[in-house]
Amino acid sequence: EGLVGFEGDGANGVRRMTTRLLSGEFPKVRHLMDIKATRSVRARTDELINSVRRVSLVAERNTPLRMVINDDSVALSAATGDQAQASEAIEAVVTNHVDGEPTITAAGFNPHYLSDALGALDTPYVHFSFTAPGKPCLVTGLNDFDGKPETDYRHVIMLMRLPS
């Protein structure tokens, strides 16, 4: 009861998928997509993917990948105690959307979640929208570096708490 099945021929033969309709209410997530950024970062998607891949090699299972947001770059770093450390900086355009001191100067990401979000983008540039430490970050693609963020794919990542 409540099952739906799909079947089709593909390059690797016949594919079948069955799914079940769940009752209940889906969590309300629409408000997460309407983040009013206090600070945003734009960078090349491929550079960021490669940098995240290299730096996260030393991150342990629950260790956040730290993104330090500077005026014209972001620095990614990860460490495993005193045993291994990695850091790398890439060029970025950082925009403050509020007057005064930036509300967020560093963000902690789960390296796997960040890699998944970046890997799903099919645009040459990525746009991060930050609100405050510990609040969700919206990741979107950019076809033109100075253009508007794409709205066909949006990825929300909850930031991790960074150790002092």
For the regions a protein language model found, what residue spans apply to each?
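Extended macromolecule-engaging scaffold surfaces
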Residues: 1-164
